[in-house]
Swiss-Prot record:
Protein residues bound to heme b b566: H97, H196
Gene Ontology biological process terms in this record: mitochondrial electron transport, ubiquinol to cytochrome c
Protein name: Cytochrome b
Remaining remarks: Heme 1 (or BL or b562) is low-potential and absorbs at about 562 nm, and heme 2 (or BH or b566) is high-potential and absorbs at about 566 nm.
Essential cofactor(s): heme b
Membrane topology label: Multi-pass membrane protein
One GO term describing the cellular component: respiratory chain complex III
Entry keyword set: Electron transport, Heme, Iron, Membrane, Metal-binding, Mitochondrion, Mitochondrion inner membrane, Respiratory chain, Transmembrane, Transmembrane helix, Transport, Ubiquinone
Transmembrane segments: 33-53, 77-98, 113-133, 178-198, 226-246, 288-308, 320-340, 347-367
Single GO MF annotation: ubiquinol-cytochrome-c reductase activity
Main location: mitochondrion
CDD domains listed in its UniProt record: cytochrome_b_C (cd00290), Cytochrome_b_N (cd00284)
Source organism of the structure: Artibeus planirostris (Flat-faced fruit-eating bat)
Amino acid sequence: MTNIRKTHPLLKIINSSFVDLPAPSSLSSWWNFGSLLGVCLGVQILTGLFLAMHYTSDTATAFNSVTHICRDVNYGWLLRYLHANGASMFFICLYLHVGRGLYYGSYTYSETWNIGILLLFAVMATAFMGYVLPWGQMSFWGATVITNLLSAIPYIGTDLVQWIWGGFSVDKATLTRFFAFHFLLPFIVTALVMVHLLFLHETGSNNPTGIPSDPDMIPFHPYYTIKDILGFLVMLTALATLVLFSPDLLGDPDNYIPANPLMTPPHIKPEWYFLFAYAILRSIPNKLGGVLALVMSILILAIVPILHMSKQRSMMFRPLSQCLFWLLVAVLFTLTWIGGQPVEHPYIIIGQTASVLYFLIILFLMPMISLVENYLLKW
C-alpha cells in the first residue's frame, strides 16, 4: 500500500519539500539558517499577533498601550521582549544566511537569490515600521529622519514624503498606516518565502564544495530534520537568554521617553541591524548621493551573480577570495560600529573609508582576485 504522505494532494507537497526531499550529503551548519529564519518568522508573527490585540495605534495612547502590555497583560512583558529581540535574532540569521550564499556561491541560483533580496527588503521595511510603533523618542525621530530621505528624490520628493506621512509631519496618520503595514508585511514575507523555497526546490540545494551533488543525495528526513531541530534549540536558547537576562541590551534607552516633536535626541540612530547602511548613508555629504548609496548597499547583492568571474562556484578552495570575504565582514562590523557613533572626527573619515572599501571589494576586488585565481590554476 502506498504511503498516504505520497498520495494525498496536500501531504504530497509537504512530503516533497520536507520529508523525501533529496539533499546533498555534505551540508554544514551554515545551511541551518534558512530553517532558523522560518522559526524566527513564526515567532514574530505569533508574538506580534498577541501584541496587536492590546496595542493602540494612536499618538495619544501608543506609548501607554506598550507600557500597559508590559505591566498589566499576563506575560505581556515576555511577548514584547520576545518580539523586539526576536527581530534581532531574525537579522542575525538573515545576515549569516546571505553571507553563506556569498561565500559558497549560492547566488548562481539567480531566481532564488533575487527573491531572497526582495525578502531582505521586505523584512527591513517591516522592522523599520515596527520600530516606530512604541512611539518613543527614537521611534518618532527615526521615522522623521528616514522618511525624510525620500525628499531627496528630484521633483516628486517632497510630495512623496507628505503622502507617506499623511500630513506635514510624522503624526497620527503616519503611526496608523505604519501599524497597518507592519501587520500586513509579514504575511507578504511568508508568501515570498514560499516562492523562495519553490525556486530552491527547482534546482536543489548548493553544497559547501560548489560541485554538483546529484550522485550523492540523502533524504531530508531524518538527517536534516534532526540537524534543524538542534539549530532551533540553540537559537531559542540564545533568544530566551537575551529576553530573560538583558532584554534591553540591543535597544535604545531614548525609546523609553515618550515621543516629543519639540525635543530632538542627541544622537538619532536606527536599531543595530541597520547601522551599517546608516553609516554608508551618513558618509556621503550629498543627500541624494547618500540615499542612492544606502539603497545600493543592499541592491548591490543583485549584481553579485554577474560579477562572478571564478571557474569555481564556492570559495572553499579559493584562499585569496576567502581573505577578501573576511575583509568584507570586518568592513561591515566597522560600519555597524560607526553608524552608532556621533558625526565627528575621527568617525567621519573611518566611515567614509569603510564605505569606499565595501563597494570596492564587491565591485572590483572580488572579480579581479577571481580572475587571478583562475590564472594561477591555469584555467
